[in-house]
């Protein structure tokens, strides 16, 4: 019996842009693709951009004879240069092209890799804004589309376009119905590229000394896009972000089996003070947060001190609501668990700030959520600059 599984290769390297890589991995897996994450380094662990550590499924050197329906390259520097200089990857991508199978790339990778390898000749392509001149020298027409399809090559621009890019790849592999299904779960922005906004009530200043100290806990089956968006964006803003694992291992497998590495165990920072504690979602991940007494106690102390705390996706419903952390507050959460909120007046809002509490809905709102935190700490101008730089 013929198999209808679609196989995808995503190579990663030291200096890969983690939000792009993680979004591609998780969105394509949501669509039903069999995704292999392969390190082009000599070990499966890679140090991605912004101090984020990822663990691949395998080494590229072990699978060079494998055939995939799609090979998709993330960006980031120096990761994009490393991918370009990987001869094994170049050979695989060129064979992919000559055999008429799909190739895709985002950010700097269209110019650095696909363009350098001669695969964009006669094609329309897009990429990260600062690479457009280089891209124009390697393709027929460099365009500013958020996602560009030309034949069997798909290109895109940067972190903020990655989910749209990945949805397009699902459509190429599985058809529009599956793409629309995944898109509706993720809650993509209705107006990508426009200035982000959020709903704010009971406005208060979020204070900090020198640099915001922010805790991002992660647990088994946490939603990876939400976790990495928070860390990626907040570190771009120069906040001091600590990734802490709930459990006994620093290595955590997210809800879509992407492997992330925390810097500390939550137990090691349970007595420390933070300017913000902010939780990613994921249904099972949020339930693990809710069952972690130390984390719940930290959140209660944060609330008692009137210090900011936040959550996205299932975390407001499963962690905040049952522990009284939304009492008197307007909040939002993922649509599938919104019935658990006692006050449902703001559940359709993408990001809600009520005094010292910030909540949001889903992977598709994670960058807006992160930028809203930047705005609360640093002001609107810096948040808009980051939004522009990441192409939200």
From Swiss-Prot:
Domain PfpI endopeptidase: 6-174, 212-378
Induction, per UniProt: By high light, copper, hydrogen peroxide, methyl viologen and cis-jasmone, but not methyl jasmonate.
Consequences of knocking out this gene: No visible phenotype under normal growth conditions, but mutant plants have increased susceptibility to oxidative stress-induced cell death and accelerated cell death in aging plants.
Keyword Nucleus: yes
Family annotation (Pfam families): DJ-1_PfpI
Keywords: Cytoplasm, Nucleus, Repeat, Stress response
One cellular-component annotation, GO: cytosol
InterPro entries according to UniProt: Class_I_gatase-like, DJ-1, DJ-1/PfpI, Prot/Nucl_acid_deglycase
GO molecular function terms listed in the Swiss-Prot or TrEMBL record: glyoxalase III activity
Major location category of this protein: cytoplasm
GO biological process, one term: positive regulation of cellular response to oxidative stress
Compartment list: Cytoplasm, Cytosol; Nucleus
Subunit structure: Homodimer. Interacts with CSD1 and GPX2.
Record-stated family: Belongs to the peptidase C56 family.
Record protein name field: Protein DJ-1 homolog A
Species of origin: Arabidopsis thaliana (Mouse-ear cress)
Gene of this entry: DJ1A
């Amino acid at each position: 019996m013929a198999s209808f599984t679609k196989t995808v290769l995503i190579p990663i390297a030291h200096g890969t842009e983690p939000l792009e890589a993680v979004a591609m991995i998780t969105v394509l897996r949501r669509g039903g693709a069999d995704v292999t994450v392969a390190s082009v380094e000599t070990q499966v662990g890679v140090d991605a951009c912004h101090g984020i550590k990822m663990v691949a499924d395998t080494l590229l050197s072990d699978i060079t004879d494998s055939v995939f329906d799609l090979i998709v390259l993330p960006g980031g520097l120096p990761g994009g240069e490393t991918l370009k200089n990987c001869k094994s990857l170049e050979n695989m991508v060129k064979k992919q092209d000559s055999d008429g199978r799909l190739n895709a790339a985002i950010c700097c990778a269209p110019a650095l890799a696909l363009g350098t390898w001669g695969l964009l000749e006669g094609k329309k392509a897009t990429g990260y804004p600062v690479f457009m001149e280089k891209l124009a020298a390697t393709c027929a027409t460099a365009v500013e589309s958020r996602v560009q399809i030309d034949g069997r090559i798909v290109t895109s621009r940067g972190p903020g376009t990655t989910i749209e890019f990945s949805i397009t790849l699902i459509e190429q592999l599985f058809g529009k119905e599956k793409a629309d299904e995944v898109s509706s779960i993720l809650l993509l922005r209705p107006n990508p590229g426009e200035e982000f906004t959020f709903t704010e009530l009971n406005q208060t200043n979020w204070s900090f000394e020198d640099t915001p100290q922010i805790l991002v806990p992660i647990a088994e089956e946490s939603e990876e896009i939400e976790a990495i968006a928070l860390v990626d964006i907040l570190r771009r803003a120069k906040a001091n972000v600590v990734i802490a694992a709930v459990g006994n291992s620093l290595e955590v497998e997210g809800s879509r089996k992407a492997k992330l590495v925390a810097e500390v165990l939550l137990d090691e920072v349970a007595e420390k003070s933070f300017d913000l504690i902010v939780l990613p979602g994921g249904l099972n991940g949020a339930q693990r947060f809710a069952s972690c007494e130390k984390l719940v106690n930290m959140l209660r102390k944060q609330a008692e001190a009137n210090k900011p705390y936040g959550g996205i996706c299932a975390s407001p419903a499963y962690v905040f609501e049952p522990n009284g952390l939304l009492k008197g507050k307007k909040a939002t959460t993922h649509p599938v668990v919104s019935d658990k909120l006692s006050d449902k007046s703001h559940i359709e809002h993408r990001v809600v700030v009520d005094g010292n509490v910030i909540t949001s809905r889903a992977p598709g709102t994670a960058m807006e959520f992160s930028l809203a935190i930047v705005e609360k700490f640093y002001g609107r101008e810096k948040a808009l600059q980051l939004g522009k730089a990441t192409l939200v």
